[in-house]
Amino acid sequence: LIRKHFGYDKWLVCGGSWGTTLAMAYGICFPQCVTGFILRGVFLGSKSENNWLYQRDGAAKFFPDAYRDFLQPLAEKHKLDPLSGYHQLLQSDNEVAAIAASKAWYLWELRISSLEHTHITSSYIEDKHQAWCMSLVSNHYLYHSCFLADDYFFNNIAKIKSIPAILLHGRYDMVCQVDVAYALTEAWDNATLQIIPQAGHGGFESQTIDAFCKATDVMAKFLEQDIN
């Protein structure tokens, strides 16, 4: 609707983290409308990615203190399946419990998302509306496996593999795994991957901002040559 509203037949689609999932899903459904992709912090919504992010054997091994706090709102029976436990809490009629859970969920991702933690302020955590909205939406989609088959993107890569793409991924991204971006690039004929050496997952880290700006310049020049 936005594309049609502004009268564009095709456009460059960009996204970060969950935005990469949406961008690629859009491209698979409407490849004729996409001139290219710039994707930062690739996330494909797979079970293994969810396990990495929320189970004990993934990012939790690097942030055991933060993971302890993440599990704190959950009943003991839910600590082996945090996605399910948080789904119940966030959907609860108990507003106090739901808000406490939303802050813990939100803080977990904030604490593991960046090598530069200067952007994490008390306002992020204490803004209960922001925390609750973000937590409720993200948990809803992840609890339902993003409403996608586990290998959806690899099974449908043929629909977008001719479209140029630049993938950017922090070397120390603890939210989304760099090997997922690497595997996607291997399957995508017209994609390149830049691993940002001193960056995590956050979109506002200095090297990530620089890489994203340069990627837009590269893509603009490429598309201009393609048009001419």
Descriptions of predicted regions:
Residues 9-48:
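Conserved hydrolase catalytic core segment
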Residues 1-11:
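Conserved acidic catalytic loop of the alpha/beta-hydrolase fold
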Residues 32-86:
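A catalytic-pocket lid/entrance helix-loop region that shapes and gates access to the active site
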Residues 160-161, 167-169, 173:
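Short beta-strand/loop motif that positions the catalytic acidic residue
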Residues 149, 174-180:
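Conserved alpha/beta-hydrolase "acid-adjacent" motif
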Residues 191-228:
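Catalytic active-site module of serine/aspartate enzymes centered on a nucleophile-bearing elbow/loop
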Residues 140-157:
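Active-site nucleophile elbow and catalytic-triad environment of alpha/beta-hydrolase enzymes
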Residues 100, 178-191:
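Active-site-adjacent alpha-helix of alpha/beta-hydrolase-fold enzymes
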